[in-house]
Amino acid sequence: MAERVEIVYDRGRWRLFNAMRREAAAMMAPLRAAHIDCLAYGSLARGDVSDGSDIDVFIPGQQSPTIVEAALERHGVRPTGREIVQATPGYAAKAYIYTAELRGYSLPLVELRPTEREFYSFAGSIRPEQVEAGLRVPGVDKRLMLIEPTPGGHVESHVAGREGEVAKLLGVGINIVLERVRTLERRRRVGRTGVYLKRVLSPEESFSEVLRELSLSRPALRRRTR
């Protein structure tokens, strides 16, 4: 049986959690008003936030970045930066719209593969109404620890060797769990490697035109945009 360690949150951590949830709800509001589906994921969904936690509102599906940007602009949200990122040649390219340090929105620019979609459930994800309700869900953190919320904090346990059990608990396929275990264990051994592609956009550029431009010289990206 896996060793389970209980973590009890102090008042400061609960205050941080509640403040970040309010901020996430405000960030999601412009998208909800435009009927754009969105998720909060990671530590914000699980509850194990820290001072270094980010708020990345993820927009699933292949929503037009132009429509997303227009929805944000209507509510006075101004980006501080925008970029296209493709982590590896095989991964989906994504648009990132930053609004402050450790705050922003992301959306895929190509159709996601099943394991890419399931990553968000693997990490723990919730919808806007669940953000507002204070719901916390189980998920796996960057240490490959399964985080299971409790009334006073959470219980954490190792994922390695329990991939099937964890997949069942999170409602995801075994492949995403095995893939993340391989990726994170390799990262532990060799360190974090740089991303395959990162292209910062100027205020005048659109995501669609830059993606089209990049795909002309990047075969791996071009294959994912077909």
Residue ranges of model-derived segments:
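Catalytic core of pol beta-like nucleotidyltransferases
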Residues: 1-37, 45-51, 61-226
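Short loop/edge segments at beta-strand edges and connector loops
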Residues: 42
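Charged, often glycine-rich, active-site loop that binds/positions anionic groups
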Residues: 54
